[in-house]
Amino acid sequence: MGNCCSHGRDSADNGDALENGASASNAANSTGPTAEASVPQSKHAPPSPPPATKQGPIGPVLGRPMEDVKASYSLGKELGRGQFGVTHLCTQKATGHQFACKTIAKRKLVNKEDIEDVRREVQIMHHLTGQPNIVELKGAYEDKHSVHLVMELCAGGELFDRIIAKGHYSERAAASLLRTIVQIVHTCHSMGVIHRDLKPENFLLLNKDENSPLKATDFGLSVFYKPGEVFKDIVGSAYYIAPEVLKRKYGPEADIWSIGVMLYILLCGVPPFWAESENGIFNAILRGHVDFSSDPWPSISPQAKDLVKKMLNSDPKQRLTAAQVLNHPWIKEDGEAPDVPLDNAVMSRLKQFKAMNNFKKVALRVIAGCLSEEEIMGLKEMFKGMDTDSSGTITLEELRQGLAKQGTRLSEYEVQQLMEAADADGNGTIDYGEFIAATMHINRLDREEHLYSAFQHFDKDNSGYITMEELEQALREFGMNDGRDIKEIISEVDGDNDGRINYDEFVAMMRKGNPDPIPKKRRELSFK
């Protein structure tokens, strides 16, 4: 979480959310990887429940039972070191897969705000895990001395190191790279997250392959936000801080400024605002003068300069949004970014949910109920943002307005279709449970204990099978018996044609159609 500036609690609203973020009541729903649930070994044996684990005392940081990360992982060499913690290579004992483990010493969390920062980082990483080009959180652990975040390993190194190694670098390559970075930020903003520390060091390559995916990392300063919410903390890294951050009145537009600074560096090799001291850098940022006359700027295209100017507009209200940057002519020159409204993450998940059968939708409702507060805090904040009258439900108009605020333009028919998809009981509104089920990321289906809980919900008599009668009863409980022949649903899932669904068939249905989980300073640059 290292940075050059102070950081802490942003607003009473965010603070309250964090205070309730990972309560002891959710202790049983630990987010750290656990012993794999026992899966039935034959189609005739009922599945066994996941083995019970002895729970430790409640940790003061994550607010749930403490666990020893070394029970599941072996820690190896040091990969990096920051203000608050150290990152080590770690190996999962059960699989041999390698990850990165960020260890935060609890003795360095000296006040309530520091603890809330760590909780929020965990909540935000859970919220964003599964999104393209964002590093995945595999589990969070707390022991007596430290908090450990086990994350996807990005073994390809820092983005700018790769660029330096390549040598020659074209505007087209810069545009392609910027497109990926802005798409990451668009995803964060559409999911109600401001990164607040965007800089080249926080973009890593997944592996050393030529076409390795780019991953955004380090969400230690990130915050949840609602449209119109104003933040006051001065956070970030000096070269990349927006002027409104220095004025203590800012929102998601500050992330666009930071990317604009990165683009300027990509194109000419030095930052736009430079001085010998941090205060000198801040004064240069507040003056806002950007040099486009020194080499190599005369040879850089007018379209590139136009985009930099619009991203480094000192007035955040006039600055481009992430969606507008993606539709800028310089970004679009190779035709890869179409001039159409972009789906935000919630929109994409609603569309995916709409295509599922009712059996799978009910199973997702059950799984949603198994998730811990820290896993769904981001979605909880998004629900509250859309539920403008605080009624506990989202109406058609609130859904339309909520998606519009996230930059999604939809026809009346499209909004109605999404409403009908999420409104499982057909009462004309979306309640909290329906919203979580429809918008949680399908990577939650990787957790064996979640799948087993859902299977047990249907298997009322614990026979190890879901019968037509049990399925019909479950659909009726959730108001989702839409008249479709239960036999038709069973036949889609019943692989061995015995007229009922066993655990393996249930798991296959839940994971069908879902993407496989992935196994898991300033630089003087000169680009021609």
Curated annotation (Swiss-Prot):
UniProt keyword terms in alphabetical order: ATP-binding, Calcium, Kinase, Lipoprotein, Membrane, Metal-binding, Myristate, Nucleotide-binding, Phosphoprotein, Repeat, Serine/threonine-protein kinase, Transferase
Function: May play a role in signal transduction pathways that involve calcium as a second messenger.
Positions that bind Ca(2+) 4: D494, D496, D498, R500, E505
Pfam families: EF-hand_7, Pkinase
Stated name of the protein: Calcium-dependent protein kinase 17
Organism in which the protein naturally occurs: Arabidopsis thaliana (Mouse-ear cress)
Gene: CPK17
Domains (record comment): There are 3 contiguous domains conserved in the CDPK subfamily: a kinase domain, an autoinhibitory (junction) domain and a calmodulin-like domain. The autoinhibitory domain (337-367) inactivates kinase activity under calcium-free conditions.
Single GO BP term: protein autophosphorylation
Topology of the protein relative to the lipid bilayer: Lipid-anchor
Domain Protein kinase: 73-331
Composition-biased stretches (Low complexity): 20-45
GO MF: ATP binding; calcium ion binding; protein serine kinase activity; protein serine/threonine kinase activity
Summary of activators and inhibitors of this protein: Activated by calcium. Autophosphorylation may play an important role in the regulation of the kinase activity.
Region spans: Autoinhibitory domain: 337-367
Family as reported in the entry's similarity comment: Belongs to the protein kinase superfamily. Ser/Thr protein kinase family. CDPK subfamily.
A GO-annotated cellular component: cytoplasm
Residues reported to bind Ca(2+) 3: D459, D461, S463, Y465, E470
Residue numbers binding Ca(2+) 2: D423, D425, N427, T429, E434
